Amino acid sequence: MKKIVSMIVAAAVLFSAACASASETAEYMWAELPEFISFVTEPCSNIALFSADYNEDDIIRKIYEGAAEQRSEITVSDSPLVEDSALTSSEIGKKTGEILADIILKVKYTYPEMYFVKNGFTVRRYTSGRVSVELNYSEGIDNVQKRMRLYAAFKEDILSLITEDMTDFQKAVTVHDYIVMNLKYDTSYNVYDAVNMALGGSGVCQGYAQMFYDICANELGMGCGFAVGQNKTPGEAGHIWNVINIDGAWYHTDATYDDPLFIDSETEALTDAPLRVSHKYFLISDEKLKSINPNDSIDRENIDCAVECSDAYYDENRPWDDSSSAQIIVNDGAIYYISGNKIMKKSDAEEAVCIITEGANHIEAGIGIYGDLLFACYKQSIYWIKLSTGESGQFYNSSSGSAMIKYLRIDGGVLRFTLSEPNSVRFSVGAVPLGETDGQILGAELIDGKIVALLRSTAKKAALYAADSEGFVKRASVVPGLNRVFAEYTGDAAYSLRLLLWTDGLKPLDAR
């Protein structure tokens, strides 16, 4: 099961014995690993909702603005946050520190760009009533700005998939599936925030939850928040996930648990399962959450969550549960998904229809859409289905012995797929460019888990591609007579080509 290292809050409060005319300073130290926190934002709001006697929204704004400029001291209030004649000065100082610790946590969770704010801080209370905090920063503004530009580009890739006519469900599943399919769980437990998770490609549950929140709440204006569960074993790591508002009702969504892992049969290491996405923990109720996995190490009976997720609509209406970890595709106002051995299409408020029959044998566990073509995999082949006419045909056939194509996805005009040997849990990843959709991929070879060359052929011409670290490069366009092409490019060390080019009679040229 996916875990993060234990998170423990240790607080030490120190008070000076200042006289009444001098400033009174209280220090509240925060442990290096902060505790999880639960809160929500309502739809179309980009600030968390809290209930308090003081203006927390105003304090959040001041801390955010001050931290963005990396000020050494930030005034959060001109008057005391705690006024109670029954409390001693030390007790007031401690309570003030606890309040601000909670608020700073909320700032860090709500805004991933605050990742550079370290966990230790100092609270200062002055005789005038003014309250300030001194924050510590892990890196300078210039480096933060560079990282944020990269993070903004990552988010833009997700947001480019969102259209104004999408339903709440379609937006949520698009964000969920993109995060799961493009990122992986950090089994070294080093990355906790969304920014560094996006830049490095991996993170723990805190990073998954923060990124889902940032896109859904901050960018799309959807109601979203965090829920927390403690480990059933005292002292072991807890877990954090999201709650999301869909059409006025709240549901649990756990992208971390929906990102499959497997144990590598050779290294015995816990490894990301590429191109796979589960929806087992997507849009479920409180009751479903409690019953979904009785052996879960997380106590789902006693969670910390600011809202009730009592609506069971998606508990009972989730045909994609049978999709074997295939992506749910949103395209032209409809969703496409695998249910059993059928590819289904469902438009909003309409019944789902099957666009591929049970006997078509085109379905394994992956689908993708590029223009008017839907791609699906079965055994050693990838097939295409023309959505406008229902025509279908073979697009690609693996040349890697008995390896089976299991999963696929399309991103940026490139179709990526996984290959695995029978009775093995190891995966290789290949890719095919989709710039020319009228031809069929005739042959390819995987080297070190990456496809390094392929041939696309139509009745009149053929094109040879090679992949290097920069991406796909079109090397030649030729008419039939492929022995010449084969001889010319197999010795090209720059691309490490190892081709199987197929021609008449489907005979490999290198065997003739």
Language model region names:
Residues 21-156, 346-358, 384, 393-397:
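Linear, non-domain "peripheral" regions
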Residues 140-197:
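Secondary-structure boundary elements
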Residues 207-287:
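Hydrophobic/aromatic-rich core segments of domains that either
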Residues 320-330, 360-371, 401-412:
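Repeated scaffold domains used in trafficking and secretory/extracellular systems
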Residues 337-338, 375-377, 416-419:
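Residue position within the beta-strands of beta-propeller blades
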Residues 340-341, 456-462:
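Short proline/glycine-enriched turn/loop motifs at strand-loop junctions of beta-rich domains
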Residues 402-433:
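Blade-level signature of beta-propeller repeat domains, shared across WD40, Kelch, NHL, RCC1
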